[in-house]
Amino acid sequence: MAEPVALTDSGIPEAIATAAERGHQVAVAYIDDDGYPSVSFRGTTQVIGPDRLAIWARTRDTGLAAAIAERPQVGLVYYGPGGPGPAYMALRGRAHADPSLDDAVYAAAPQGERDQDPDRNGVAVVIEIDRVQGFGQDGPFLQERTA
């Protein structure tokens, strides 16, 4: 049976926060304007609540930030053996741009990522997580949003 989504437990925040510096960025998938999956690594992924992640999208009007306005469903994959928290997680949820979080998400991003968007042309994207499936120190786990 699945547990409730709890991204703030079991070392998940540390695993996500240090993923980029350990060379294990989170991959984010969304459906592009042509109806095809688009997958990219996101070094700015952050846990911002028990069932929410945030990332910095470097552009507001193209790519991920534009696509989620019409197609908010996203998938994420993390693989970080030997690091803190789970070794593997597959997550799914719904994303939306949230300019009210721009300052906080940009400031929490690694310097190398901020250097890619020094003029802050991007926007914070918040992902409400519905499901997390993974493998941690205690074996496989499943977390799902409860109604």
Residue ranges and their predicted role:
Residues M1-A147:
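Binding-site signature for planar aromatic cofactors or substrates
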